[in-house]
Swiss-Prot record:
This is 5'-methylthioadenosine/S-adenosylhomocysteine nucleosidase. It is an enzyme of class 3 (hydrolase). It catalyses: S-adenosyl-L-homocysteine + H2O = S-(5-deoxy-D-ribos-5-yl)-L-homocysteine + adenine; S-methyl-5'-thioadenosine + H2O = 5-(methylsulfanyl)-D-ribose + adenine; 5'-deoxyadenosine + H2O = 5-deoxy-D-ribose + adenine. Pfam families: PNP_UDP_1. Belongs to the PNP/UDP phosphorylase family. MtnN subfamily. One of its GO terms (biological process) is L-methionine salvage from methylthioadenosine. The gene is mtnN. InterPro entries: MTA_SAH_Nsdase (IPR010049), Nucleoside_phosphorylase_d (IPR000845), Nucleoside_phosphorylase_sf (IPR035994). Its EC number is 3.2.2.9. It comes from Shewanella loihica (strain ATCC BAA-1088 / PV-4). Pathway: Amino-acid biosynthesis; L-methionine biosynthesis via salvage pathway; S-methyl-5-thio-alpha-D-ribose 1-phosphate from S-methyl-5'-thioadenosine (hydrolase route): step 1/2. Catalyzes the irreversible cleavage of the glycosidic bond in both 5'-methylthioadenosine (MTA) and S-adenosylhomocysteine (SAH/AdoHcy) to adenine and the corresponding thioribose, 5'-methylthioribose and S-ribosylhomocysteine, respectively. Also cleaves 5'-deoxyadenosine, a toxic by-product of radical S-adenosylmethionine (SAM) enzymes, into 5-deoxyribose and adenine. It comes from the Bacteria. GO terms for cellular component: cytosol.
């Protein structure tokens, strides 16, 4: 079994890479891929960079070069669920773009033309992630809708619009739907797992800077535990 793991920033992948053995590193198009062993599985970890375009490039290169059986997107997100605290985790039940609008042509809000409205994660990965929750002690995890866009959300007015469009949204971030869309086109099973670094409000920039390392570490621990259950 070969598993690709994608995080946008160094704090989101650092613990994973430090936990790997027998590593080999290759850089393609400025993106570093670290292949090795983790929890008895063959894994490839990459730091994609921030945003949907860089995430799409990294995912395409990962799939074309390494042919993983599964892809896991790990990292931080802004939270929209009152019962979750910073550091808690959202496991994707579905993934959508929140900044796409081609409704003039009959598509749903958030649906890219000629693509599904929602990208559905692999249930084997989701169930393994849910089993992994027990390994994380007091960290809480839920399964929910994760939305993606090329903006850092900290404006209450934008938050209202997003929640009006996606009332069940549990978290938002900047890469997941792009990764999911590439996986969909290549028919590679995926899951998005995000730890909350902020609550998508006026305090988000301060919270994000303060809690990114914590969120990245929690998400990485979740991924490592998930691997044990595959």
């Amino acid at each position: 079994m070969k598993i690709g793991i994608i995080g946008a920033m160094e704090p989101e992948v650092a613990h994973l890479i430090a936990s790997m053995t027998d590593t080999q590193t290759q850089t393609i198009a400025g993106i570093e891929f670290v292949a090795g062993q983790l929890e008895g599985k063959e894994v490839i970890v990459t730091r994609s960079g921030i945003g949907k375009v860089t995430a799409s490039v990294a995912t395409t290169l990962l799939i074309e070069k390494y042919a993983p059986d599964y892809v896991i997107n790990t990292g931080s997100a802004g939270g929209f669920v009152d019962s979750l605290a910073i550091g808690d985790i959202v496991i994707s039940s579905e993934v959508r773009h929140h900044d796409v609008d081609v409704t003039a042509f009959g598509y749903e809000i958030g649906q890219m033309a000629q693509q599904p409205a929602a990208f559905m994660p692999d249930r084997t990965l989701v169930e393994a992630a849910k089993k992994a929750v027990a390994d994380l002690g007091e960290v809480k995890a839920i399964e929910g809708l994760i939305c993606t866009g090329d903006s850092f959300i900290c404006d209450p007015e934008r938050t209202k619009v997003m929640l009006n469009n996606f009332p069940t949204m549990a978290a938002c971030e900047m890469e997941g739907a792009a990764i999911a869309q590439v996986c969909h086109q290549f028919k590679v099973p995926f899951v998005v797992i995000r730890s909350l670094s902020d609550n998508a409000n006026n305090d988000s920039p301060v919270d994000f800077d303060s809690y990114l390392v914590k969120a990245g570490h929690h998400s990485a621990l979740m991924v490592i535990s998930l691997l044990k259950h595959l």
